[in-house]
Amino acid sequence: MDMVINAKKTFCLRVGRRASVICANIVTLNGIALQWSDELRYLGVYIVRSFRFKISLDKPKRSFYRAANSVFGKVGHVASEEVIIQLFNSKCVPVLLYALEACSLSKSDLCSIDFAFNRFFMKLFRTNNIEIVKNIQSYLGISLPSVVLGNRSVKFELSFGLFAR
């Protein structure tokens, strides 16, 4: 069975202690050299060249902001806050949290995700006061993405027999 590799869509990436070392090109059986990349997309997750396994949150956050602005663009401030939050939870949050329970995120990554989440509420309720946003989220029973990801990670690890972090 011959499996042809599409060299235009195939990239090489190095993770580990020698991630920054320049490598020789890998050549396919057809004689086509595969490109080395600093970032690649695999199953919708952007993996970054690093000393440890690391993912990039730039594109998911960009997609999240696009989805959130789309919700505001469609319903604006015409719909009630409850409707907008329901749309936000069903259309925007999954874009931000896709597959992150399977990745180990740094504290700065989690803070970055929480910041994007909180900015939506600041825009919705027309405030820049984070305490007001936290009170609203608490009153509505809305958890920050870092908390949701913590719970999802535990479920993921238990379902696959992995040890808790």
Protein language model regions, located:
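Short, conserved micro-motifs composed of acidic
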Residues: 3-39
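Short coil/turn segments at secondary-structure boundaries
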Residues: 7-9, 82-86, 99-107, 131-137, ...
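Basic, alpha-helical interaction scaffolds
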Residues: 31-104
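Structured, non-transmembrane catalytic/binding cores
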Residues: 11-15, 21, 55-63, 123
